[in-house]
Design a protein with these regions (language model features):
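Bacterial Sec-dependent N-terminal signal peptides
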Residues: 1-25
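Early extracytoplasmic/domain-onset interaction patches
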Residues: 25-96
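Hydrophobic alpha-helical and helix-loop surface patches within well-folded domains
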Residues: 27-28, 32-46, 59, 301, ...
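A surface-exposed beta-strand-loop module
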Residues: 73, 83, 89, 118-197, ...
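Short, hydrophobic/aromatic-enriched beta-strand segments in well-ordered soluble domains
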Residues: 78-80, 84, 97-99, 163, ...
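Short aromatic-acidic-glycine turn motif
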Residues: 99-109, 248-251
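Glycine/proline-rich low-complexity spacer/linker segments in large multi-domain proteins
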Residues: 105-119, 123-124, 180-238, 259
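Hydrophobic helix-coil surface modules that form long, contiguous segments used
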Residues: 212-216, 220, 228-400, 429
Length: 473
C-alpha cells in the first residue's frame, strides 16, 4: 500500500508539472520561434508557477567542441548566460566537472577501496585529467560587455568561481570557459565511454562539459561531489556544435539544425537499418563513409526546455526511424545500432514509438521533438537520448526503462542526489506498466534451446521481475 501511495503522489506531481498548456507543442522538426524565457514557451516555469514566490535559475548554453579521434580529447568552449532569479546576491558560482571524479585520490576511488575494489586507471585518468578548466571569464553583465576577474578553487569534481562583483537578484552574467575533457578506459564505471567499434572508436559524450551547479530555494548551492550516480541541473537552452571526423554518425539532444548537410537523403538511405537485416551478429561492419584524415564535419544542435546535453557518435551506426503521435504532433523515434547488431534491432524504433505513445497517453504527453535509443553498451538516460544495449526481445524492458526516465528525470528534473527514489522508483513502476501495456503480463523470450527448459521453465511474469522481487530480496 505504501508503494502504491508513493506512485500515486509521483503521478500527480508529474501531471501537474507538465500538463499546463500540454496541448501546445512546438513544431517538432525545426527550432521554435521563441526562446526558453519567452512568454510563448508553454514549458517555461514563469508561465506556470506552482505557487507565489516560486523561482528557479535559467541557463543558456552555447558550446563549441571538437572531438579528436586520434587522441580521444574533447577541446571546447562553453559560453553560458546565467540568470539569477533568486532573491539572493551571489558572490560566487559553482560548476560540476564530473569527469574529475574518476582519478586517483578522489571520493570515487575512496568509495571503491572501502568496498574492497581497487580501481585501475587509463593514461589520462592516471595523470589526473578528466575535465580540465584553467580559466573562467565574465564577458558580459546584463547583456553589456564586461571584463571581470575571477579566481578558481577546485575540490575534485566541484569548481568554485569567485566573482569580482556579486550577481544581484534579477541580473545575468555571461561566462566563458575553455575546457578539455578526456575519454578514457579505466575500470571505474564512467558513463562517458569510449570503446572500439570496427576500426574506430565509439564515443558517448555525457557529463562532458563544465555544468553550472543548481542554486535553489531549498538547498542553496548543490555542491555534492560526483560519485558516478545521480544528477541535477537547471532548465534552459543549449546551442551546441560538435566537430567530428567526417565518417562519424552523430546524434544528440535537440534539433539537428543542419540535417541536410550532415544527413542528405542519399546517405540516409545507405545507412538505413533495413539494409542490414540479414547481417550476421558481430560481423565486421561495411564502410559507408570512408575515413579521410583531416576531413571534418560539424553537427549543429539546438535544444530547449532541457537541463543537460549529451551525444553519441560511431562510424558504424545504422539508423532506424518511426514516428510516434502525441497530441496530434509527431515525435521522431530514432534507433541507432552498430551494424553488426542491426539484424536484432530491426524493431527498436517502432518499439520506442509504442513506449512514447503509451506513456504519453497514460501519464502525460512527451514534450520533445525526438527520442533516441542507441546501441551503446550501457543503460542510461539523458534528455531525448538513451544509451542502451542488448538485442530483441531481451532489450525491451531496458528500452522501456530508459525511455521512461524522460518523464521524471527529464521533464520534472528533480534533485536526484537528494531524492533519488523519485525518479528511479517511478521509472521502475513505468517499466512494468509499459511492458504490460505493450507485450502483456509475461516477458517475451527466445524459444528455449532444449526440451527440458521448454517443459519446466515457468514464464517470467513482469510484475514479479520488475516490481516485487526488489522487496523479496
Amino acid at each position: 500500500m505504501r508503494y502504491l501511495q508513493i506512485i500515486f503522489i509521483a503521478i500527480c506531481c508529474l501531471s501537474g508539472f507538465v500538463s499546463v498548456n500540454a496541448q501546445i507543442i512546438p513544431d517538432h522538426f525545426s527550432r521554435p520561434a521563441y526562446s526558453y524565457r519567452s512568454e510563448q514557451n508553454p514549458y517555461y516555469w514563469k508561465n506556470k508557477k506552482p505557487f507565489d514566490g516560486y523561482w528557479q535559475q535559467d541557463v543558456e548554453y552555447a558550446i563549441k567542441a571538437a572531438i579528436d579521434e586520434k587522441t580521444d580529447i574533447v577541446d571546447g568552449k562553453v559560453v553560458l548566460t546565467y540568470y539569477n532569479n533568486s532573491p539572493d546576491a551571489l558572490p560566487f558560482v559553482y560548476f560540476h566537472l564530473y569527469q574529475e571524479a574518476f582519478q586517483p585520490e578522489t571520493y570515487v576511488e575512496e568509495l571503491n577501496l572501502s568496498n574492497d575494489v581497487k580501481p585501475t586507471y587509463g593514461k589520462y585518468e592516471g595523470a589526473g585529467l578528466g575535465t580540465e578548466v584553467t580559466e573562467v571569464k565574465i564577458i558580459k553583465r546584463n547583456g553589456k560587455k564586461a571584463d571581470e576577474k575571477t579566481t578558481l578553487v577546485q575540490d575534485i569534481s566541484v569548481l568554485r568561481v569567485n566573482l569580482e562583483k556579486p550577481i544581484q537578484p534579477g541580473e545575468n552574467i555571461t561566462i566563458e570557459i575553455p575546457f578539455k575533457t578526456y575519454f578514457d578506459t579505466g575500470s571505474l564505471r564512467r558513463r562517458m565511454k569510449k570503446f572500439k567499434s570496427g576500426d574506430f572508436m565509439h564515443y558517448d559524450g555525457v557529463h562532458w562539459y563544465p555544468r553550472i551547479c543548481v542554486y535553489d530555494r531549498k538547498m542553496g548551492w548543490d555542491t555534492d561531489q560526483h560519485l558516478g550516480k545521480e544528477f541535477y541541473g537547471d532548465f534552459g537552452s543549449f546551442e551546441v556544435e560538435l566537430t567530428f571526423a567526417s565518417n562519424y554518425i552523430v546524434e544528440a539532444t535537440g534539433y539537428l539544425e543542419n540535417e541536410q548537410d550532415m544527413m542528405p537523403r542519399s546517405l540516409r538511405e545507405k545507412l538505413d537499418i533495413k539494409n542490414f537485416a540479414n547481417k550476421p551478429w558481430e560481423e565486421q561492419p561495411s564502410v559507408i563513409i570512408p575515413y579521410v584524415e583531416g576531413d571534418k564535419k560539424t553537427w549543429k544542435y539546438y535544444a530547449i526546455n532541457v537541463h543537460d546535453f549529451a551525444f553519441t557518435a560511431d562510424p558504424n551506426y545504422r539508423i532506424g526511424e518511426s514516428m510516434a503521435f502525441v497530441n496530434g504532433q509527431q515525435v521522431k523515434c530514432v534507433a541507432l545500432v552498430q551494424e553488426g547488431h542491426a539484424a536484432f534491432w530491426q524493431n527498436a524504433a517502432d518499439y520506442t514509438k509504442k513506449i512514447i505513445e503509451t506513456f504519453s497517453r497514460d501519464f502525460t504527453p512527451y514534450i520533445w521533438p525526438k527520442i533516441i535509443v542507441a546501441d551503446a553498451r550501457d543503460g542510461m538516460e539523458y534528455p531525448m537520448l538513451t544509451l542502451d544495449g542488448g538485442y530483441d526481445p531481451s532489450y525491451r524492458d531496458l528500452l522501456i526503462h530508459e525511455v521512461g526516465h524522460m518523464w521524471y528525470f527529464g521533464m520534472v528534473g528533480n534533485n536526484e542526489t537528494y531524492r533519488a527514489s523519485l525518479d528511479e522508483g517511478f521509472t521502475q513502476f513505468l517499466t512494468a506498466w509499459g511492458y504490460r501495456s505493450i507485450d502483456g503480463d509475461y516477458r517475451v523470450q527466445f524459444p528455449e534451446d532444449n526440451k527440458y527448459k521448454a517443459k519446466y521453465r515457468k514464464p517470467d511474469e513482469i510484475m514479479m521481475s520488475e516490481v516485487y522481487y526488489a522487496y523479496l530480496n
